[in-house]
Amino acid sequence: MSSLYSKLSVLKDDENFFLNSRTNKTVKEIQKELNITIDEAMVLSIIISYQIQDTYSTSFDSLKKDFKLQSDEYLKYLNIAYKLEKKGFIALAEERRRGRSSRISPEFNVDDMIFNKLILGYDYLDDVDFSDIYSVVKVIAELIYKKDDKKLTEFRLVSEANRVFDKLDIKEEFT
């Protein structure tokens, strides 16, 4: 997955991205890795591309300008972005949370765990000792803390907890 960095970083400069995105191998790879729809993978991919090249957050309005999107296309992709936000893959930038930008031209940033997994190739579950009950409980507690701290949505908490449980070998005895 770490090779995604170079593949994603150039998407921002592809003026035909939205026309060709459904057949883009990088978009399909992200769709498969995160188990999301092709449209969600497309929007997430372009937000990551902007985030890699420029700043911590991506002004969604810049997509409209850079890709010359018509209003109905822009609203379609914006709706998908809000679905990604609800699922916890992206978050509204802090300025938006304080009410400094509108719902029609928000700024988003990619969740740190998603960014680390896709770009850096780091999955926090690789550091968990699944034979140690305390290690498993600790990672679940950290997820709950992130949810309480509004850094993780309920949807993502459940999906991340399920990832932990899926990696847990029920037959294995804890030490």
Identify the role of each PLM range.
Residues M1-T175:
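Intrinsically disordered, low-complexity N-terminal extensions of AAA+/P-loop NTPases
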